[in-house]
C-alpha cells in the first residue's frame, strides 16, 4: 500500500480528495492536514510515501512545505493539487520534485491518471535494482506519448506548449 497524506486547508476539497483516493486501489490515507504545522506533525507520526499538496493555504503555504521537506531531505513524493496556475509556481514545484501537478478544478479521470501513473512507477522502482536505457526510456516517456494524443485547448498549439514548458 502507498501511504498518502492530503494537505488541504479547505475541508470540502480535502473530503473530495479523500473520496477520490478511496476509489483507487493501492492507496491508504494516513491523514488530512489543513496547515503546514499539522502536515509536519502527521509526517512525524506516520510513514508517508505520497503527499497530495495544496499550494494556497493560510500561514505557510504548500510551496514552503515542499521547500522544507526538501531541505530536510524527506524522501516523500508530492503531487500538487492546487488552484495555483501561475507558471512560476508550477515550475518551482516541479524543480522541488513534484511528480505531477493538477490545477483545480479537475476531473476525477485526471486525478485517477496521476495516481495510477504514480502507483505504476512505484511498482517498477520497487521491483528493479537496475534498468537498461531502453527500460528507462520506456518508463520516462510512456506518459509523454499518451499526453500527445490529448486535444489541446483552442488557440494552443504543440509548439507553443513546448515553448512554455521549456522556458
Each model region followed by its residue ranges:
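Conserved acidic carboxylate
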Residues: 8
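Acidic, metal-coordinating helix/loop segments flanking the phosphotransfer/catalytic sites
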Residues: 32-50
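Acidic catalytic/metal-coordinating carboxylates
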Residues: 35, 61-64
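Active-site residues of response regulator receiver
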Residues: 54, 82
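Receiver (REC) domain active-site loop signature in two-component systems and cognate sites
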Residues: 57
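Short amphipathic alpha-helix used as the core "switch/output" element in two-component signaling
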Residues: 63-74
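C-terminal output/effector regions of signal-responsive regulators
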Residues: 136-167
Amino acid at each position: 500500500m502507498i501511504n498518502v497524506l492530503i494537505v488541504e486547508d479547505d475541508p470540502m476539497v480535502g473530503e473530495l480528495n479523500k473520496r477520490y483516493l478511496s476509489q483507487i486501489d493501492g492507496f491508504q490515507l494516513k491523514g488530512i492536514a489543513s496547515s503546514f504545522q499539522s502536515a509536519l506533525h502527521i509526517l512525524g507520526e506516520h510513514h508517508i510515501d505520497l503527499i497530495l499538496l495544496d499550494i494556497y493555504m493560510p500561514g505557510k503555504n504548500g510551496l514552503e512545505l515542499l521547500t522544507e521537506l526538501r531541505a530536510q531531505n524527506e524522501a516523500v513524493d508530492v503531487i500538487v493539487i492546487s488552484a495555483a496556475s501561475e507558471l512560476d509556481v508550477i515550475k518551482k514545484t516541479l524543480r522541488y520534485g513534484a511528480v505531477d501537478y493538477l490545477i483545480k478544478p479537475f476531473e476525477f479521470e485526471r486525478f485517477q491518471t496521476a495516481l495510477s501513473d504514480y502507483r505504476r512507477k512505484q511498482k517498477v522502482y520497487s521491483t528493479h535494482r537496475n534498468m537498461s536505457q531502453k527500460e528507462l526510456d520506456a518508463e520516462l516517456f510512456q506518459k509523454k506519448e499518451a499526453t500527445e494524443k490529448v486535444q489541446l485547448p483552442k488557440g494552443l498549439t504543440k509548439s507553443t506548449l513546448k515553448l512554455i514548458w521549456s522556458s
